[in-house]
UniProtKB/Swiss-Prot annotation:
CDD domains: RNA_Cyclase_Class_II. It is found in: Cytoplasm. This is RNA 3'-terminal phosphate cyclase. One of its GO terms (cellular component) is cytoplasm. It comes from Pyrobaculum calidifontis (strain DSM 21063 / JCM 11548 / VA1). Catalyzes the conversion of 3'-phosphate to a 2',3'-cyclic phosphodiester at the end of RNA. The mechanism of action of the enzyme occurs in 3 steps: (A) adenylation of the enzyme by ATP; (B) transfer of adenylate to an RNA-N3'P to produce RNA-N3'PP5'A; (C) and attack of the adjacent 2'-hydroxyl on the 3'-phosphorus in the diester linkage to produce the cyclic end product. The biological role of this enzyme is unknown but it is likely to function in some aspects of cellular RNA processing. Belongs to the RNA 3'-terminal cyclase family. Type 1 subfamily. It is an enzyme of class 6 (ligase).
Length: 347
């Protein structure tokens, strides 16, 4: 059994998500202790438990300590199952973080995995669902993984109620990705959404984002999505840039009470511009998710990221605990190069 100190590095839910995903897909039991020990509300919270229980559902895992507030969890997986699964987070807990946990497992299932997930689509401290659709899924696609994400209804804090359907096709082996330079920007697109709010909120967010990008010489095609089917109000913007060599980077921002729509649009644009100006092949959020796929792929993968975040360093550490790999990190001007010789995991 692999033992992981949950207070290492970033010391949050990321350690748990990565450890559980790798435990499940490799069939190796794991014990995570000191879970979120340094946080104001230590231990497992409902959104963490959802990911753990969902991974257990996919692998018939035995669990110890899977309770709210628990600082120790033992996860003993069996075989990966496939087919359809219903997952209800029960709060506005992030659907995206559940997708992040389950995708690597589902890629190595014996047949396609279909997930119907209820919870929060656009919530703080997690990637928005449109980021998962238009940045995460294409990047996983470069490794040879097919992930299809469909949003049936959006859900915001505090009520949630969002509904998302995900389909993951199995792979025999993941391909390595060699992406050092972002390349030339082909197009920038985006979605500005508003739920149970006036249409002008989505329009103002989109306009402000487009103006901020235009000042830097970039034209953007940002669509607006106005819906009135949510359990509560909410808004946000996700932008993404695609390059001539197949790279995708993103930037996003969430609306909140008292925050002008224009500020939301500008914030998303600034995040995207940070990634573009660095010339990195992935943005800093995608980098910490990508290292799992790099380590599982067959052969040498290389990516560059605008910054070496604590999340990224923590994830590399966890991956190295589960797999016989060693990440190499090198500073390249404004970027950091991450390189690893993957194990070529097969189903």
């Amino acid at each position: 059994m692999i033992r992981i100190d949950g207070s290492y590095g970033e010391g949050g839910g990321q350690i748990l998500r990565t450890a559980i995903a790798l435990s499940a897909l490799l069939g190796v039991p794991v014990e995570v202790f000191n879970i979120r020990a340094k946080r104001a509300n230590p231990g497992l919270q409902p959104q963490h438990l959802t990911g753990v229980n969902a991974a257990a559902l996919l692998t018939d895992a035995e669990l110890e300590g899977a309770a709210k507030g628990s600082t120790r969890l033992v996860f003993k997986p069996k075989t990966i199952k496939c087919g359809g699964f219903q997952i209800d987070i029960g709060t506005a807990g992030s659907i995206s973080l559940v997708i992040q946990t389950l995708t690597p497992i589902a890629l190595f299932a014996p047949c396609p995995v279909r997930l119907s997930i209820t919870g929060g689509t656009d919530v703080a401290w997690a990637p928005p669902i449109d980021y998962m659709r238009f940045v995460f899924a294409p990047v996983v696609g470069r490794f040879g993984g097919r992930v299809k994400i469909e949003v049936l209804r959006r859900g915001h804090y505090p009520k949630g109620g969002g509904r998302v359907e995900v389909e993951v096709a199995p792979v025999d082996v993941l391909k390595p990705v060699d992406a050092v330079d972002f390349g030339k920007v082909l197009k920038i697109r985006g979605i500005s959404h508003a739920v149970n709010l006036p249409a002008h909120v989505a329009e103002r967010q989109a306009r402000a984002a487009a103006e901020a990008l235009a000042k830097e010489g970039y034209a953007a095609d940002i669509s607006t999505e106005v819906r009135n089917d949510g359990l509560g109000p909410g808004s946000g913007v996700v932008l993404w840039a695609e390059s001539d060599v197949g790279n995708v980077v993103g930037g996003d921002a969430l609306g909140e009470r008292g925050k002008p729509a224009e500020a939301v649009g500008r914030e998303a644009a600034e995040k995207l511009l940070t990634a573009l100006k660095s010339g990195a092949s992935v943005d800093s959020h995608m980098a910490d998710m990508a290292v799992v796929y790099m380590a599982l792929a067959e052969g040498v993968s290389r990516i560059t990221t605008p910054e070496l975040t604590l999340h990224l360093q923590t994830n590399m550490y966890i991956v190295e605990r589960f797999l016989p790999v060693k990440f190499r990190v090198e500073k390249l001007g404004q970027r950091h190069l991450i390189e690893v010789n993957g194990v070529g995991r097969r189903r």
